[in-house]
Amino acid sequence: MHDHAATTPGPIAAAERWIRNAFLEKLQSVKGTYLENQVDSTTPSLDFDFVQKFVPREGVRTSDPEAYVGCSLPCRPDMGGSCGCEYTKKCDCLEYAAVDEHRLQQQDPARYAKYIQERDSGDIIEYAGLPKRFPYSNPKKGPKVLQSFYREQRHPIYECNLNCTCGPGCKTRLVQKGRKVNLTIFKTANRGWGVYCNNDLVAGQFIDVYLGEVLTNDETTRREAKADADKGSYLYSLDKFIGDDGAPTADTCYVVDGQYIGNATRFINHSCEPNCRQYTVSENKYDTWVYNLAFFAYEDIPKETELTFDYMDKDEEEEEDVLRKRQLAALDPTNGDRRPCNCGASKCRGYLWGDDL
Protein backbone atom coordinates (compact mmCIF):
# COMPACT_ATOMS: atom_id res chain seq x y z
CA MET A 1 0.00 0.00 0.00
CA HIS A 2 1.35 3.39 -0.98
CA ASP A 3 1.83 5.52 2.15
CA HIS A 4 0.82 9.13 1.47
CA ALA A 5 1.56 9.90 5.11
CA ALA A 6 5.25 9.79 4.23
CA THR A 7 4.85 12.96 2.13
CA THR A 8 3.11 15.07 4.80
CA PRO A 9 4.74 17.16 7.57
CA GLY A 10 6.42 15.31 10.44
CA PRO A 11 3.94 15.45 13.37
CA ILE A 12 0.93 14.98 11.08
CA ALA A 13 2.60 12.12 9.24
CA ALA A 14 3.46 10.41 12.51
CA ALA A 15 -0.14 10.67 13.72
CA GLU A 16 -1.48 9.37 10.42
CA ARG A 17 0.93 6.42 10.48
CA TRP A 18 -0.13 5.61 14.05
CA ILE A 19 -3.81 5.62 13.02
CA ARG A 20 -3.02 3.53 9.96
CA ASN A 21 -1.10 0.96 11.98
CA ALA A 22 -3.85 0.80 14.61
CA PHE A 23 -6.45 0.07 11.93
CA LEU A 24 -4.22 -2.53 10.28
CA GLU A 25 -3.86 -4.20 13.65
CA LYS A 26 -7.65 -4.48 13.83
CA LEU A 27 -7.66 -6.00 10.35
CA GLN A 28 -5.31 -8.78 11.45
CA SER A 29 -8.22 -10.46 13.20
CA VAL A 30 -10.25 -10.53 9.97
CA LYS A 31 -9.25 -13.27 7.57
CA GLY A 32 -8.77 -12.25 3.94
CA THR A 33 -9.38 -8.51 4.38
CA TYR A 34 -6.93 -5.81 3.29
CA LEU A 35 -6.56 -2.02 3.19
CA GLU A 36 -5.45 0.13 0.25
CA ASN A 37 -5.16 3.90 -0.13
CA GLN A 38 -3.55 5.36 -3.24
CA VAL A 39 -5.49 8.64 -2.97
CA ASP A 40 -4.47 10.34 0.28
CA SER A 41 -3.15 9.64 3.77
CA THR A 42 -6.46 8.97 5.54
CA THR A 43 -7.54 5.75 7.24
CA PRO A 44 -11.02 4.42 8.12
CA SER A 45 -12.22 5.48 11.56
CA LEU A 46 -10.72 3.69 14.54
CA ASP A 47 -14.21 3.86 16.08
CA PHE A 48 -15.16 0.97 13.80
CA ASP A 49 -14.79 -2.55 15.21
CA PHE A 50 -14.86 -5.77 13.19
CA VAL A 51 -17.15 -8.60 14.32
CA GLN A 52 -18.06 -12.02 12.93
CA LYS A 53 -21.74 -12.13 13.87
CA PHE A 54 -24.66 -9.88 14.77
CA VAL A 55 -24.47 -7.99 18.07
CA PRO A 56 -28.01 -7.84 19.56
CA ARG A 57 -28.72 -4.80 21.73
CA GLU A 58 -31.24 -4.20 24.51
CA GLY A 59 -34.77 -5.29 23.65
CA VAL A 60 -33.75 -7.58 20.78
CA ARG A 61 -34.69 -11.24 21.11
CA THR A 62 -32.89 -13.80 18.99
CA SER A 63 -33.49 -17.53 18.50
CA ASP A 64 -31.19 -20.07 20.12
CA PRO A 65 -29.57 -22.10 17.30
CA GLU A 66 -29.95 -25.21 19.46
CA ALA A 67 -33.72 -24.73 19.20
CA TYR A 68 -33.86 -24.43 15.40
CA VAL A 69 -36.13 -26.99 13.74
CA GLY A 70 -34.02 -29.11 11.40
CA CYS A 71 -34.94 -31.39 8.53
CA SER A 72 -35.43 -35.05 9.37
CA LEU A 73 -34.26 -36.84 6.23
CA PRO A 74 -30.56 -37.57 5.69
CA CYS A 75 -28.90 -35.95 2.69
CA ARG A 76 -27.27 -39.06 1.25
CA PRO A 77 -24.69 -38.74 -1.53
CA ASP A 78 -25.76 -42.19 -2.79
CA MET A 79 -29.36 -41.10 -3.31
CA GLY A 80 -29.31 -40.85 -7.10
CA GLY A 81 -27.55 -37.83 -8.58
CA SER A 82 -26.24 -36.73 -5.17
CA CYS A 83 -29.76 -35.83 -4.11
CA GLY A 84 -31.10 -35.44 -0.60
CA CYS A 85 -32.20 -31.96 0.44
CA GLU A 86 -32.24 -31.25 -3.29
CA TYR A 87 -35.30 -33.50 -3.33
CA THR A 88 -37.18 -30.45 -2.18
CA LYS A 89 -40.55 -32.05 -1.46
CA LYS A 90 -38.99 -33.86 1.50
CA CYS A 91 -36.65 -31.20 2.93
CA ASP A 92 -38.37 -29.61 5.93
CA CYS A 93 -36.04 -26.59 5.87
CA LEU A 94 -37.19 -25.71 2.35
CA GLU A 95 -40.89 -25.79 3.31
CA TYR A 96 -41.31 -22.04 2.72
CA ALA A 97 -38.91 -21.77 -0.22
CA ALA A 98 -40.21 -20.55 -3.57
CA VAL A 99 -42.57 -23.09 -5.14
CA ASP A 100 -41.44 -24.61 -8.43
CA GLU A 101 -44.70 -23.82 -10.19
CA HIS A 102 -43.68 -25.36 -13.51
CA ARG A 103 -42.83 -28.72 -11.93
CA LEU A 104 -45.97 -28.66 -9.82
CA GLN A 105 -48.17 -28.02 -12.85
CA GLN A 106 -46.56 -30.90 -14.73
CA GLN A 107 -46.57 -33.38 -11.85
CA ASP A 108 -49.90 -32.62 -10.13
CA PRO A 109 -52.31 -30.39 -12.11
CA ALA A 110 -55.02 -30.60 -9.42
CA ARG A 111 -52.67 -29.52 -6.62
CA TYR A 112 -51.30 -26.79 -8.91
CA ALA A 113 -54.81 -25.39 -9.42
CA LYS A 114 -55.39 -25.41 -5.64
CA TYR A 115 -52.04 -23.69 -5.05
CA ILE A 116 -52.78 -20.95 -7.61
CA GLN A 117 -56.18 -20.35 -5.99
CA GLU A 118 -54.55 -20.09 -2.54
CA ARG A 119 -51.81 -17.79 -3.83
CA ASP A 120 -54.08 -15.42 -5.75
CA SER A 121 -56.78 -15.20 -3.08
CA GLY A 122 -54.34 -14.55 -0.25
CA ASP A 123 -55.37 -17.72 1.59
CA ILE A 124 -52.88 -19.68 3.69
CA ILE A 125 -50.86 -21.87 1.35
CA GLU A 126 -50.17 -25.47 2.30
CA TYR A 127 -46.49 -25.56 1.34
CA ALA A 128 -45.66 -29.02 2.70
CA GLY A 129 -45.10 -31.54 -0.08
CA LEU A 130 -44.88 -28.98 -2.89
CA PRO A 131 -41.79 -29.00 -5.12
CA LYS A 132 -39.55 -26.02 -4.32
CA ARG A 133 -36.87 -24.08 -6.12
CA PHE A 134 -33.47 -25.20 -4.85
CA PRO A 135 -31.37 -22.11 -4.07
CA TYR A 136 -27.91 -23.04 -5.30
CA SER A 137 -26.37 -24.73 -8.30
CA ASN A 138 -23.27 -26.82 -7.80
CA PRO A 139 -21.19 -26.80 -11.01
CA LYS A 140 -18.41 -29.34 -11.46
CA LYS A 141 -15.96 -26.45 -11.79
CA GLY A 142 -16.07 -23.18 -9.90
CA PRO A 143 -18.04 -22.08 -6.83
CA LYS A 144 -21.63 -22.75 -5.89
CA VAL A 145 -23.83 -19.95 -7.21
CA LEU A 146 -27.28 -18.62 -6.47
CA GLN A 147 -29.75 -19.89 -9.06
CA SER A 148 -30.86 -17.25 -11.57
CA PHE A 149 -34.48 -17.57 -10.40
CA TYR A 150 -33.50 -16.37 -6.92
CA ARG A 151 -31.14 -13.71 -8.27
CA GLU A 152 -33.98 -12.10 -10.18
CA GLN A 153 -37.03 -12.81 -8.02
CA ARG A 154 -35.59 -12.00 -4.56
CA HIS A 155 -37.44 -14.77 -2.71
CA PRO A 156 -36.08 -15.64 0.75
CA ILE A 157 -33.36 -18.27 0.62
CA TYR A 158 -33.46 -21.10 3.16
CA GLU A 159 -30.52 -23.21 4.30
CA CYS A 160 -30.33 -26.25 6.56
CA ASN A 161 -28.98 -25.81 10.09
CA LEU A 162 -26.99 -27.52 12.85
CA ASN A 163 -30.00 -29.60 13.93
CA CYS A 164 -30.54 -31.14 10.50
CA THR A 165 -29.67 -34.77 9.84
CA CYS A 166 -28.31 -33.93 6.38
CA GLY A 167 -24.89 -32.94 7.73
CA PRO A 168 -22.33 -30.28 6.76
CA GLY A 169 -22.01 -31.47 3.15
CA CYS A 170 -25.63 -30.62 2.33
CA LYS A 171 -25.81 -28.45 -0.77
CA THR A 172 -28.13 -25.91 0.87
CA ARG A 173 -25.28 -24.81 3.14
CA LEU A 174 -23.41 -21.89 1.65
CA VAL A 175 -23.83 -18.54 3.41
CA GLN A 176 -23.52 -20.15 6.86
CA LYS A 177 -20.02 -21.34 5.94
CA GLY A 178 -18.83 -17.76 5.64
CA ARG A 179 -16.86 -15.72 3.15
CA LYS A 180 -14.45 -17.58 0.86
CA VAL A 181 -13.13 -14.64 -1.20
CA ASN A 182 -10.59 -11.96 -0.27
CA LEU A 183 -11.79 -8.35 0.01
CA THR A 184 -9.90 -5.06 -0.01
CA ILE A 185 -11.19 -1.87 1.59
CA PHE A 186 -9.84 0.93 -0.62
CA LYS A 187 -10.06 4.70 -0.89
CA THR A 188 -12.01 5.95 -3.90
CA ALA A 189 -11.43 9.25 -5.66
CA ASN A 190 -14.81 10.80 -4.79
CA ARG A 191 -16.92 8.42 -2.69
CA GLY A 192 -14.93 7.74 0.43
CA TRP A 193 -14.06 4.14 1.14
CA GLY A 194 -15.15 1.29 -1.08
CA VAL A 195 -14.59 -2.45 -1.44
CA TYR A 196 -13.30 -4.66 -4.22
CA CYS A 197 -12.76 -8.39 -4.44
CA ASN A 198 -9.26 -9.74 -5.02
CA ASN A 199 -10.73 -12.63 -7.00
CA ASP A 200 -12.85 -12.80 -10.14
CA LEU A 201 -16.50 -13.32 -9.22
CA VAL A 202 -19.13 -15.11 -11.30
CA ALA A 203 -22.81 -14.17 -11.34
CA GLY A 204 -24.53 -15.61 -8.29
CA GLN A 205 -21.35 -16.12 -6.26
CA PHE A 206 -21.64 -15.47 -2.53
CA ILE A 207 -19.47 -12.63 -1.24
CA ASP A 208 -20.25 -11.97 2.44
CA VAL A 209 -23.02 -10.95 4.84
CA TYR A 210 -23.80 -7.54 6.30
CA LEU A 211 -23.15 -7.38 10.05
CA GLY A 212 -23.68 -4.87 12.82
CA GLU A 213 -25.68 -4.13 15.93
CA VAL A 214 -29.27 -5.39 15.87
CA LEU A 215 -31.54 -2.68 17.27
CA THR A 216 -35.17 -2.22 18.12
CA ASN A 217 -37.07 0.25 16.01
CA ASP A 218 -37.27 2.68 18.93
CA GLU A 219 -33.50 2.61 19.47
CA THR A 220 -32.95 3.15 15.75
CA THR A 221 -35.20 6.22 15.81
CA ARG A 222 -33.28 7.58 18.79
CA ARG A 223 -29.92 7.12 17.04
CA GLU A 224 -31.16 8.67 13.80
CA ALA A 225 -32.32 11.77 15.68
CA LYS A 226 -28.79 12.32 16.98
CA ALA A 227 -26.91 11.40 13.79
CA ASP A 228 -26.04 13.20 10.57
CA ALA A 229 -27.56 12.55 7.15
CA ASP A 230 -25.12 9.72 6.40
CA LYS A 231 -26.58 7.50 9.12
CA GLY A 232 -29.12 5.99 6.73
CA SER A 233 -26.31 4.46 4.68
CA TYR A 234 -25.56 2.01 7.49
CA LEU A 235 -29.09 1.05 8.62
CA TYR A 236 -30.86 -1.98 7.15
CA SER A 237 -34.34 -2.95 8.30
CA LEU A 238 -35.06 -6.64 8.78
CA ASP A 239 -38.43 -6.16 7.12
CA LYS A 240 -38.52 -8.97 4.55
CA PHE A 241 -41.41 -10.82 6.19
CA ILE A 242 -43.63 -7.88 7.14
CA GLY A 243 -47.23 -8.92 6.56
CA ASP A 244 -46.67 -12.62 7.29
CA ASP A 245 -48.37 -14.23 10.28
CA GLY A 246 -46.29 -13.74 13.41
CA ALA A 247 -43.86 -11.46 11.59
CA PRO A 248 -42.88 -7.95 12.70
CA THR A 249 -44.62 -4.85 11.45
CA ALA A 250 -42.98 -1.79 9.93
CA ASP A 251 -42.98 -0.25 13.41
CA THR A 252 -41.58 -3.25 15.28
CA CYS A 253 -39.05 -4.84 12.93
CA TYR A 254 -35.42 -4.86 13.99
CA VAL A 255 -32.74 -2.82 12.24
CA VAL A 256 -29.06 -3.64 11.64
CA ASP A 257 -26.71 -0.71 12.30
CA GLY A 258 -23.28 -1.30 10.77
CA GLN A 259 -21.81 2.16 11.24
CA TYR A 260 -19.47 1.37 14.13
CA ILE A 261 -19.62 -2.42 14.38
CA GLY A 262 -19.62 -4.79 11.42
CA ASN A 263 -17.39 -6.23 8.71
CA ALA A 264 -15.90 -5.25 5.36
CA THR A 265 -19.31 -5.06 3.65
CA ARG A 266 -20.01 -1.94 5.70
CA PHE A 267 -17.70 -0.09 3.28
CA ILE A 268 -19.48 -1.18 0.07
CA ASN A 269 -20.71 1.88 -1.83
CA HIS A 270 -24.05 2.54 -3.46
CA SER A 271 -24.71 2.44 -7.19
CA CYS A 272 -27.93 2.97 -9.10
CA GLU A 273 -26.65 0.21 -11.44
CA PRO A 274 -25.04 -2.19 -8.94
CA ASN A 275 -23.04 -5.31 -9.65
CA CYS A 276 -24.12 -6.95 -6.37
CA ARG A 277 -27.43 -7.52 -4.63
CA GLN A 278 -28.41 -8.24 -1.06
CA TYR A 279 -30.65 -11.23 -0.30
CA THR A 280 -32.46 -12.66 2.71
CA VAL A 281 -30.91 -15.97 3.83
CA SER A 282 -32.32 -17.90 6.80
CA GLU A 283 -31.27 -21.05 8.65
CA ASN A 284 -34.47 -20.99 10.71
CA LYS A 285 -37.65 -20.94 8.64
CA TYR A 286 -39.76 -19.92 11.64
CA ASP A 287 -37.71 -16.84 12.55
CA THR A 288 -39.06 -13.85 10.64
CA TRP A 289 -37.27 -11.33 12.89
CA VAL A 290 -33.54 -12.03 12.50
CA TYR A 291 -31.84 -13.52 9.43
CA ASN A 292 -28.75 -13.00 7.28
CA LEU A 293 -28.36 -10.14 4.81
CA ALA A 294 -26.16 -11.80 2.19
CA PHE A 295 -24.36 -10.18 -0.74
CA PHE A 296 -24.12 -12.10 -4.01
CA ALA A 297 -22.58 -11.02 -7.30
CA TYR A 298 -25.41 -10.00 -9.64
CA GLU A 299 -23.16 -10.35 -12.68
CA ASP A 300 -19.65 -11.52 -13.51
CA ILE A 301 -17.26 -9.13 -11.75
CA PRO A 302 -13.55 -9.01 -12.68
CA LYS A 303 -11.15 -8.86 -9.76
CA GLU A 304 -10.32 -5.39 -8.37
CA THR A 305 -13.61 -3.99 -9.71
CA GLU A 306 -15.44 -1.97 -7.05
CA LEU A 307 -18.37 -3.84 -5.52
CA THR A 308 -21.61 -1.87 -5.31
CA PHE A 309 -25.24 -2.42 -4.38
CA ASP A 310 -28.36 -0.27 -4.43
CA TYR A 311 -28.94 1.23 -0.99
CA MET A 312 -32.57 1.84 -1.98
CA ASP A 313 -32.98 -1.76 -3.20
CA LYS A 314 -35.05 -0.77 -6.22
CA ASP A 315 -35.90 -2.93 -9.21
CA GLU A 316 -34.21 -2.09 -12.50
CA GLU A 317 -35.82 0.69 -14.51
CA GLU A 318 -35.58 1.86 -18.11
CA GLU A 319 -32.90 4.52 -18.59
CA GLU A 320 -35.30 7.13 -20.00
CA ASP A 321 -37.59 6.73 -16.96
CA VAL A 322 -34.65 7.25 -14.62
CA LEU A 323 -33.50 10.30 -16.60
CA ARG A 324 -36.97 11.85 -16.41
CA LYS A 325 -37.14 11.37 -12.62
CA ARG A 326 -33.62 12.73 -12.21
CA GLN A 327 -34.45 15.87 -14.17
CA LEU A 328 -37.59 16.47 -12.12
CA ALA A 329 -35.67 15.93 -8.88
CA ALA A 330 -33.00 18.42 -9.96
CA LEU A 331 -35.67 21.08 -10.54
CA ASP A 332 -37.31 20.51 -7.17
CA PRO A 333 -36.07 23.22 -4.73
CA THR A 334 -36.84 20.97 -1.74
CA ASN A 335 -34.04 18.63 -2.80
CA GLY A 336 -31.34 21.10 -1.81
CA ASP A 337 -30.61 19.22 1.41
CA ARG A 338 -30.70 15.78 -0.16
CA ARG A 339 -27.50 13.80 -0.40
CA PRO A 340 -26.32 13.71 -4.04
CA CYS A 341 -25.43 10.37 -5.60
CA ASN A 342 -21.96 10.14 -7.14
CA CYS A 343 -22.18 6.61 -8.52
CA GLY A 344 -21.63 7.80 -12.10
CA ALA A 345 -23.95 5.19 -13.61
CA SER A 346 -25.91 5.99 -16.77
CA LYS A 347 -29.06 5.29 -14.75
CA CYS A 348 -27.97 7.39 -11.77
CA ARG A 349 -31.01 8.84 -9.97
CA GLY A 350 -29.08 11.92 -8.91
CA TYR A 351 -29.84 11.64 -5.20
CA LEU A 352 -29.84 9.04 -2.46
CA TRP A 353 -33.09 8.22 -0.68
CA GLY A 354 -36.59 9.39 -1.52
CA ASP A 355 -39.72 7.56 -2.71
CA ASP A 356 -39.92 9.77 -5.80
CA LEU A 357 -36.63 8.49 -7.25
Model-found features: residue ranges?
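Accessory low-complexity/Zn-finger-associated flanking regions
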Residues: M1-G192, P340, A345-L357
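C-terminal SET catalytic tail plus cysteine-rich post-SET Zn-binding segment of SAM-dependent SET-domain
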Residues: M1-Q28, V209-T252, I261-A264, H270-L357
